[in-house]
C-alpha cells in the first residue's frame, strides 16, 4: 500500500546482525553464511545514481540538504515496495542503494526527483533539472553489495576533508554500526503540530508519513532507511570498518562501473604510492624517485586508482604541464 509508512517495513526487518552479535563463538564461515542468507532473501539490489559532472549544485546549504533528506524520506514512504539500504546526498548528485523490483526502484527516484523540483521551485531556486537523471545498475553478489554500500557511504568523506564516513549527516553511513542510535530518543513526526509536519515533509497530506521520526527538525535516518538490513550484509562491525578503510581495489571497481572520478582521498593515494614505490623501486619516499620512475608511478596511480592530476601533482611533485601531457583529458 502506498500509504504505508517506511517505518513499518523497517520494523519488520530481521536484524541479523543483532541476532548474531551476542554469539562470539560463530566462526567466519558461519557469519558469512548468515550474510549470504540475508542477501538471497532480500534482493534484487540496485545502485541508483545521478551524474554530478553534468548537474549544477542542488544542495547549497544545510537547509537545502535537510530539505532533500526529508523529501527522500517522504518518497520512501510513498514507495514502500522499495527498501532503501543506504544513500548519500551530495551537492549536485545522489547515490541510492536499494532493494526491490527495478521498476519500483525507478519509481522511488522519480517521486523523489519530482518532489525536489517542485519544492525548490517554490523556494525560488532556478535549476536546470534535465541532467538530473537516474542511472541504475544491478548488484549481483554479496561482496559487490558490500562494496557498493561502502562506496556510497564514503562519498562525502572522499569529496570533503570536513567529514569522516560516519559523520556526514545526509547519508546512511552515519548510522551504520554506530552506538548513538541507542542513546537518542527521536520524536515521532505525527506528535508534532500539523503545520510543522507539513513544513517538514513539504506536503499538505501528512498521513503517509506518520512513521517518520525527527531529531531537531532533521529526519531520523533509521526511520526511513533500512540500516538494519544494510548492517546484516556484513559479518560484524569490524568487517564493515575493514572494507570501509582498506579496500581501494574494490572502490576502483565500483568507480569504473559508475564512470566516477576521484574515489580515494589524498591520504589513501599517498599510501598506495608508498606501497607501489617500495615494491617496484625499493624506496620509501616519492622524493627518492627518478624522473622516469615518477612518470611510471603517475601512470600507475592514474590508471589503477583514478587519481586526479591534482592528487598526483601533490604527491609526486610533477609539474602541471607534465601531467597535462600525460593525461590530457584531466584538468
Regions found by a protein language model. Give the residues of each.
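Short hydrophobic/aromatic beta-strand micro-patches
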Residues: 97-99
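Short Pro-Cys-Gly-centered "Cys-loop" motif that presents a nucleophilic cysteine in a tight turn
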Residues: 1-86, 91, 101-331
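Histidine-centered divalent metal-coordination motifs
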Residues: 93-95
